[in-house]
């Protein structure tokens, strides 16, 4: 049966069932859980600085999802981004340039506020790794929601509810389509975001690897060019 929301060229978003196998998703999920455990143990025994982010960190109160375990540029997930690039190019019909990954282990009560993403997230995907189900919503009209005086202002539309199972992913124009999640009612949910640029988009060359020398490096390697 034809899947709903499967035309990226038309809708600027689509759902890909079983983008990776359930076994690979579970492996990534358990790996990420263990990494969080390692971070917590090292932090508890003061083997790492509270400002260290190489094996993830708990987001600060002013970040997008506060007090939630987060990782910019997890090496395994950056490798996964490259693995999925041919599939992403097939789905979108675009030649893509990889930028970075961002992953979280969401907890009960977390909210992903309505927003649109920065330039590095032009072509994005959120991939369900495991845990409890948590829908993501997307507004298909790019004219809805905009930034005014440095603050994002939403039209508070109903949007489209997308439910992903482990291994499924939503591909979308992160810079054009508003997306969000309502308060999480489960206990834990693992997601990884993979971000690319279209090589026909002006400025993509200077943005390669999110302005880092290569993939896998932490955020402080970013440079303005």
Language-model segments: which ranges?
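Short, active-site-adjacent segments that bind or coordinate small-molecule cofactors and metal centers
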Residues: 63-64, 180, 191
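Conserved active-site beta-strand element of glycosyltransferases/polysaccharide synthases
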Residues: 105
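Catalytic core of non-heme Fe(II) oxygenases with the double-stranded beta-helix
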Residues: 108-176, 188-191, 197-211
């Amino acid at each position: 049966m034809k899947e709903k929301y499967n035309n990226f060229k038309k809708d600027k978003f689509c759902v890909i069932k079983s983008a990776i196998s359930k076994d690979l998703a579970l492996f990534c999920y358990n790996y990420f859980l263990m990494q969080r455990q390692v971070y917590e143990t090292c932090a508890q025994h003061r083997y790492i600085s509270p400002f260290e982010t190489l094996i993830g960190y708990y987001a600060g109160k002013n970040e997008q999802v506060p007090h939630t375990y987060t990782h910019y540029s997890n090496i395994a997930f950056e490798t996964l981004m490259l693995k999925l690039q041919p599939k992403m190019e097939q789905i979108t019909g675009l030649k893509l340039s990889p930028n970075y990954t961002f992953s979280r282990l969401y907890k009960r009560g977390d909210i992903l506020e309505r927003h649109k993403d920065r330039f590095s997230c032009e072509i994005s995907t959120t991939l369900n790794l495991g845990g409890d189900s948590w829908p993501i919503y997307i507004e298909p009209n790019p004219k809805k929601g905009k930034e005014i005086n440095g603050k994002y202002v939403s039209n508070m539309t109903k949007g489209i509810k997308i439910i992903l199972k482990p291994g499924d992913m939503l591909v979308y124009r992160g810079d054009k389509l508003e997306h969000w999640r309502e308060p999480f009612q489960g206990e834990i949910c693992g997601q990884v975001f993979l971000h690319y640029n279209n090589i026909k988009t002006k400025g993509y060359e200077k943005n390669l690897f999110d302005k880092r020398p290569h993939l896998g490096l932490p955020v402080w390697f970013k440079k303005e060019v």
